[in-house]
Amino acid sequence: MDAEIISVGTEIVLGQIINTNAAYLANRLTQLDLPATYQTTVDDQSQRLERVINHALTRAQLVFVCGGLGPTADDITMPTVAKTLGKELQTDEEHWKWIQKTFEQRQIKMEPENIRQAQYPRGGEPLANPVGLALGCWYETKGKVVVVLPGPPAEFKAMVEKSLVPKLQQYFQTRKQITSRTLNFLGRPESQLMDEIEGATNDIPGISITSYVQPTAIQVRLTVRDLPVIEAEEKIDQAQKAILAVEEPFFFGVGDDLTLAKVVVEQLKKRGWKLTAAESLTGGMFQSAICSVPGASTVFNGGFVTYAASAKEKLLGIPHATIDRYGVVSSETAATMAEGCQRKLNVEVGIGFTGVAGPDMLEGQPAGTVWIGLAMKGRSTKTVQLHLASYVGRQAIRTLSVQYGLQLIYHELKK
């Protein structure tokens, strides 16, 4: 079984956006034992897309066409797919009524072109879009399948999980059984982690172990093929037990979509504690990470973005003498930021971020110099200094600072 992923979009071809959809779909297909054999990217030009689809159908049995399902002139995917298949477009009347009702409820003027989001090639099967307007499509032709999916990542992932994966599992029900589990680790170099995991699982046959590096974390996927689910889960349990006997201090949970922010929120919930933050170089990114977790309101009431020294003094009560003596980028300032926000909101945990995001130096310190302060109920205030590589850029320095802050809280809450 050969599968091909076709990504449609001039922005992707020109490198203006990163193609996360193709990576996501390829990963899910691998988990379903339907690995992609080819990936192609093409711009928003109908004739070129038609040639790409025709070529894909000569070498693949399963073809995915991703992106270009909007109502604008450059959204050419569904009409082009229909033309390539020699079919007319048909309208899903129920979905079209739902689109009209949605625009009416939101009090937004609807253009006639929006009907394109309710259309698909005649003879195909519409795929529901749980979080957007445009339908996808599943079309079977001469022993092959063409699948059309939307471009916006949130819509893409929702349609893949809710509409496409169940359809693939039903259609390819004779495929081999595949069972997998993802373990998440932090604070460990990938090469060292994988060497130790290999040593711990040498005597467990029939299990595949692969790693995927994320910012400041590593995902390790355990996979078993060709066994009934119960037997496969038992083998994975055995492997996980052997791995955690060696790597437990660096393990923070199970799941493909698990984030450290979610784990921290759950830890705080269990204690009945609340968290706040005072951010300088991260500019609210830490608080955004916390608020992205459903249910975060039970542990987070609010926080501070104190970019300027004057804001640190006014909002957090940091003595001017502290900043004047030690500087903004210092252990002392990070500590007083953490203590100040904790005190102001009367919560159990306060964290402070100060540093140099770059590209320029600040107070004689290079980009990538970061101090994080942590004030926690019943414990002495702790500070940690980071020396992040300046070449990764301003945004990466800010993102990594947030992740290291989450790590600091996580480890302290585990004690």
From Swiss-Prot:
<dbReference type="InterPro" id="IPR041424">
    <property type="entry name" value="CinA_KH"/>
</dbReference>
<dbReference type="InterPro" id="IPR036653">
    <property type="entry name" value="CinA-like_C"/>
</dbReference>
<comment type="similarity">
    <text>Belongs to the CinA family.</text>
</comment>
<dbReference type="InterPro" id="IPR050101">
    <property type="entry name" value="CinA"/>
</dbReference>
<protein>
    <recommendedName>
        <fullName>Putative competence-damage inducible protein</fullName>
    </recommendedName>
</protein>
<dbReference type="Pfam" id="PF02464">
    <property type="entry name" value="CinA"/>
</dbReference>
<dbReference type="InterPro" id="IPR036425">
    <property type="entry name" value="MoaB/Mog-like_dom_sf"/>
</dbReference>
<dbReference type="InterPro" id="IPR008135">
    <property type="entry name" value="Competence-induced_CinA"/>
</dbReference>
<dbReference type="InterPro" id="IPR008136">
    <property type="entry name" value="CinA_C"/>
</dbReference>
<dbReference type="Pfam" id="PF18146">
    <property type="entry name" value="CinA_KH"/>
</dbReference>
<dbReference type="Pfam" id="PF00994">
    <property type="entry name" value="MoCF_biosynth"/>
</dbReference>
<dbReference type="InterPro" id="IPR001453">
    <property type="entry name" value="MoaB/Mog_dom"/>
</dbReference>
